[in-house]
Curated annotation (Swiss-Prot):
Protein name as catalogued: Urease subunit gamma
Reaction catalysis annotation: urea + 2 H2O + H(+) = hydrogencarbonate + 2 NH4(+)
SUPFAM superfamilies in UniProt: Urease, gamma-subunit (SSF54111)
Predominant place of localization: cytoplasm
InterPro entries noted in UniProt: Urease_gamma, Urease_gamma/gamma-beta_su, Urease_gamma_sf, Urease_subunit
Enzyme class: hydrolase
Pfam families linked to this entry: Urease_gamma (PF00547)
Keyword Coiled coil set for record: no
């Protein structure tokens, strides 16, 4: 199977998000990379489902809360930008203050 670099990046991100979901399910708090991966995968999957950029910008702020991540992580992530594939093409989705 031949994958482009972008496709490899998407698979790596999705794999990291799966690890993050499993750790949350075990009651562990997420670190910086896990938090970014989980929110980014949420945005990418929402885009694939046909949600709007505006709704993903808002919904992306409710994926994680402070009590689900390690201390200091919310301050390390002022915003997350994801180039996601929507039914009508690729668009940049920015989520400001993603962990409240």
């Amino acid at each position: 199977m031949e994958l482009t670099p972008r496709e490899k990046d998407k698979l790596l991100l999705f794999t990291a998000a799966l690890v993050a979901e499993r750790r949350l399910a075990r009651g562990l708090k997420l670190n910086y990379p896990e938090s970014v991966a989980l929110i980014s995968a949420f945005i990418m999957e929402g885009a694939r489902d046909g949600k709007s950029v505006a709704s993903l910008m808002e919904d992306g702020r409710h994926v994680l809360t402070r009590d689900r991540v390690m201390e200091g992580v919310p301050e390390m992530i002022p915003d997350i930008q994801v180039e996601a594939t929507f039914p009508d093409g690729s668009k940049l989705v920015t989520v400001h203050n993603p962990i409240v």
